[in-house]
Protein backbone atom coordinates (compact mmCIF):
# COMPACT_ATOMS: atom_id res chain seq x y z
CA UNK A 1 0.00 0.00 0.00
CA UNK A 2 2.84 2.39 0.85
CA UNK A 3 4.44 1.61 -2.50
CA UNK A 4 1.25 2.50 -4.38
CA UNK A 5 1.00 5.76 -2.44
CA UNK A 6 4.65 6.59 -3.17
CA UNK A 7 4.29 5.98 -6.91
CA UNK A 8 1.05 7.96 -7.00
CA UNK A 9 2.72 10.97 -5.38
CA UNK A 10 5.78 10.70 -7.63
CA UNK A 11 3.55 10.43 -10.70
CA UNK A 12 1.58 13.48 -9.63
CA UNK A 13 4.73 15.51 -9.02
CA UNK A 14 6.13 14.53 -12.40
CA UNK A 15 2.87 15.43 -14.14
CA UNK A 16 2.75 18.82 -12.47
CA UNK A 17 6.33 19.62 -13.41
CA UNK A 18 5.82 18.62 -17.05
CA UNK A 19 2.74 20.81 -17.33
CA UNK A 20 4.66 23.85 -16.17
CA UNK A 21 7.36 23.25 -18.73
CA UNK A 22 4.76 22.82 -21.47
CA UNK A 23 2.94 25.96 -20.35
CA UNK A 24 6.20 27.91 -20.23
CA UNK A 25 6.99 26.80 -23.78
CA UNK A 26 3.53 27.80 -25.00
CA UNK A 27 3.85 31.18 -23.32
CA UNK A 28 7.33 31.76 -24.74
CA UNK A 29 6.17 30.73 -28.22
CA UNK A 30 3.23 33.13 -28.05
CA UNK A 31 5.40 36.00 -26.87
CA UNK A 32 7.78 35.29 -29.75
CA UNK A 33 4.85 35.20 -32.19
CA UNK A 34 3.49 38.50 -30.85
CA UNK A 35 6.95 40.03 -31.15
CA UNK A 36 7.12 39.03 -34.83
CA UNK A 37 3.59 40.26 -35.56
CA UNK A 38 4.14 43.63 -33.93
CA UNK A 39 7.54 43.91 -35.62
CA UNK A 40 5.93 43.23 -39.00
CA UNK A 41 3.31 45.90 -38.39
CA UNK A 42 5.90 48.45 -37.32
CA UNK A 43 7.96 47.74 -40.45
CA UNK A 44 4.89 48.10 -42.67
CA UNK A 45 3.92 51.39 -41.02
CA UNK A 46 7.44 52.79 -41.26
CA UNK A 47 7.69 51.70 -44.90
CA UNK A 48 4.40 53.42 -45.76
CA UNK A 49 5.65 56.78 -44.50
CA UNK A 50 2.32 57.31 -42.72
CA UNK A 51 1.74 57.08 -39.02
CA UNK A 52 -1.18 54.76 -38.39
CA UNK A 53 -2.49 52.38 -35.75
CA UNK A 54 -3.36 48.91 -37.04
CA UNK A 55 -6.67 47.54 -35.76
CA UNK A 56 -7.60 44.43 -37.74
CA UNK A 57 -6.88 42.15 -40.64
CA UNK A 58 -9.53 41.91 -43.31
CA UNK A 59 -10.67 38.74 -45.03
CA UNK A 60 -8.55 39.89 -47.94
CA UNK A 61 -5.42 39.78 -45.75
CA UNK A 62 -5.00 43.57 -45.71
CA UNK A 63 -4.29 45.42 -42.49
CA UNK A 64 -6.80 48.11 -41.60
CA UNK A 65 -5.75 51.20 -39.69
CA UNK A 66 -7.51 53.87 -37.66
CA UNK A 67 -7.11 57.48 -36.59
CA UNK A 68 -6.40 58.53 -33.01
CA UNK A 69 -10.10 59.26 -32.49
CA UNK A 70 -11.10 55.63 -33.04
CA UNK A 71 -11.85 53.73 -29.83
CA UNK A 72 -9.37 51.00 -30.86
CA UNK A 73 -6.43 53.35 -31.42
CA UNK A 74 -4.87 52.70 -28.02
CA UNK A 75 -4.71 48.94 -28.43
CA UNK A 76 -1.61 48.86 -30.66
CA UNK A 77 0.52 51.06 -28.38
CA UNK A 78 -0.85 49.08 -25.44
CA UNK A 79 0.23 45.83 -27.08
CA UNK A 80 3.73 47.21 -27.54
CA UNK A 81 3.83 48.18 -23.86
CA UNK A 82 2.71 44.69 -22.84
CA UNK A 83 5.31 43.11 -25.09
CA UNK A 84 7.96 45.41 -23.64
CA UNK A 85 6.91 44.28 -20.17
CA UNK A 86 6.90 40.58 -21.06
CA UNK A 87 10.09 40.49 -23.11
CA UNK A 88 12.17 43.07 -21.27
CA UNK A 89 13.55 44.16 -24.64
CA UNK A 90 14.79 47.76 -24.21
CA UNK A 91 14.44 48.36 -27.98
CA UNK A 92 10.66 48.29 -27.55
CA UNK A 93 10.60 51.21 -25.10
CA UNK A 94 11.12 54.00 -27.67
CA UNK A 95 8.67 52.29 -30.03
CA UNK A 96 5.98 52.12 -27.33
CA UNK A 97 6.68 55.75 -26.46
CA UNK A 98 6.41 56.83 -30.10
CA UNK A 99 3.06 55.14 -30.71
CA UNK A 100 1.73 56.37 -27.38
CA UNK A 101 2.78 59.95 -28.12
CA UNK A 102 0.82 59.80 -31.38
CA UNK A 103 -2.39 59.63 -29.32
CA UNK A 104 -1.66 62.74 -27.24
CA UNK A 105 -4.49 64.78 -28.76
CA UNK A 106 -7.00 62.15 -27.68
CA UNK A 107 -6.81 63.54 -24.14
CA UNK A 108 -9.00 66.44 -25.30
CA UNK A 109 -11.77 64.37 -26.89
CA UNK A 110 -14.72 65.59 -24.86
CA UNK A 111 -17.29 63.85 -27.07
CA UNK A 112 -15.75 60.38 -26.86
CA UNK A 113 -17.22 57.84 -24.43
CA UNK A 114 -14.42 55.33 -25.13
CA UNK A 115 -11.56 57.61 -24.13
CA UNK A 116 -10.50 55.08 -21.49
CA UNK A 117 -9.71 52.48 -24.16
CA UNK A 118 -7.57 54.97 -26.02
CA UNK A 119 -5.73 56.51 -23.08
CA UNK A 120 -5.41 53.69 -20.56
CA UNK A 121 -4.03 51.11 -23.00
CA UNK A 122 -1.37 53.52 -24.19
CA UNK A 123 -0.66 56.20 -21.58
CA UNK A 124 -1.84 54.07 -18.66
CA UNK A 125 0.58 51.28 -19.47
CA UNK A 126 3.34 53.78 -20.21
CA UNK A 127 2.85 55.37 -16.80
CA UNK A 128 2.59 52.01 -15.04
CA UNK A 129 5.81 50.71 -16.60
CA UNK A 130 7.95 53.85 -16.56
CA UNK A 131 6.53 56.12 -13.88
CA UNK A 132 6.89 59.02 -16.34
CA UNK A 133 4.67 61.80 -14.96
CA UNK A 134 3.99 63.25 -18.42
CA UNK A 135 1.88 60.13 -19.03
CA UNK A 136 0.05 60.79 -15.77
CA UNK A 137 -0.73 64.35 -16.88
CA UNK A 138 -2.32 63.10 -20.10
CA UNK A 139 -4.36 60.53 -18.16
CA UNK A 140 -5.65 63.20 -15.77
CA UNK A 141 -6.52 65.59 -18.61
CA UNK A 142 -8.41 62.82 -20.40
CA UNK A 143 -10.36 62.16 -17.20
CA UNK A 144 -11.32 65.84 -17.05
CA UNK A 145 -12.39 65.84 -20.69
What spans do the regions from the language model cover?
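Alpha-helical junction/boundary sensor with strong preference for TPR arrays
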Residues: 45, 87, 106-110, 130
Amino acid sequence: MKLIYLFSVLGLLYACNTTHKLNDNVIDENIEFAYKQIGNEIQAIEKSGKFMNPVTLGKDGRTYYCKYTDWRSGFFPGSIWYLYELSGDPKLLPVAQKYTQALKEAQYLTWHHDIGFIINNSYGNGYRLTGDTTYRSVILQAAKS
